[in-house]
Amino acid sequence: MGRKRALDRVAMGCCVAAMPPEAFLPVQHDKSVRAKKTTSFLFILHIDNFFIIPYAESSRVPNETEERKMAENMVLSFDGTKLFVNKEVDMDCRAVCVIVHGLCEHQGRYDYLAEKMHEMGFGTYRFDHRGHGRSKGTKVFYSAFDEIAKDIDVVVDRAIAENPEAPLFIVGHSMGGYGAALYGHLHPGKVDGYVLSGAWTRDNKGLGTGAVEADTPDLAYMPNELGDGVCSDPSVGEAYMADPYVIKEMSFGLFRALHKGHAWMRENASRFVDPVLILHGGDDGLVAPKDSLELYEQIASWDKSLRIYAGLYHEIFNEYDKDAVIEDALDWLNLHADLEFIDVEEEEVEGDE
């Protein structure tokens, strides 16, 4: 049975969807607190430096305490792959968010965002993608463009089963934004809305072009050189590269799989109909803001909003102005969590009579 939110079109104001793209001017923020001067740049993968790993799992060696926690928090995905899930949900939470992380990173990098959600009464489910963090699977690799959505579905089903009365949202960043957006295309109406951050839905920047065109095996790997482009705060990039759970290489096969997904979403944009807040850094050098603009223009949702933050890099939830960005996301989630449920199937039957 479908899950859908009843939206008061008068109170919400359908002008959100009707506003032309030029109405979404970059959001200006105080530059005085910036860690360093921000300049736009183009990030290009150097595909001449690659190596082959026939099979590898994400393999930081956990200690005994971590092993116990991992065993307790593992769920089986559609093909039996074990995914690590970090559940933080109070009995009286007013809504639940599934947080989906980006390429090469892990769910633990979203501690601050999750903490802010908990303060607002939201429960969270965070998981490591297959081949990432504490999850099992071939390292940083997908064999098909929809594997990420199938993994998300396992976590969503668990969240629904454990919180049947709570509104449910998906918050996805970068590759996690790709996965969240793809999930919305494949499962319209299953969750109550989406927040997308720097979502890699189109690849207008050409981040994966070299990998797609390279004459290399899918299980060939290139170095992860994303650290300098994730945030204008150098300490965030340094912590990213020093983090033992951030994987320092990525497969050509993953880029090829997601490239197919980008094309599929372009061709099937009308399938996305759910409420969505699309956020992007205006100086994102990894994923072009144009990706989010095109997604906004092409999807069929009438309840959709786009915000592009001038001067912010890729990881807007970690940027110098992160609290303002998170506040925007929480305001949107709070509004949509307060809307009443309707039953999609029953409404359709009544409409046919």
Residue ranges: model-predicted function:
Residues 288-297:
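Short alpha-helix in the alpha/beta-hydrolase fold that links the catalytic acid
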Residues 278-280:
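Short beta-strand/loop motif that positions the catalytic acidic residue
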Residues 163-173:
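Alpha/beta-hydrolase fold nucleophile elbow
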Residues 311-353:
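Catalytic active-site module of serine/aspartate enzymes centered on a nucleophile-bearing elbow/loop
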Residues 104-107, 133-159, 163:
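Catalytic nucleophile-loop/oxyanion-hole region of alpha/beta-hydrolase
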Residues 114-137:
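Conserved alpha/beta-hydrolase
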Residues 70-89:
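N-terminal cap/lid segment of alpha/beta-hydrolase-fold proteins
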Residues 283-287:
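Acidic catalytic loop of the alpha/beta-hydrolase fold
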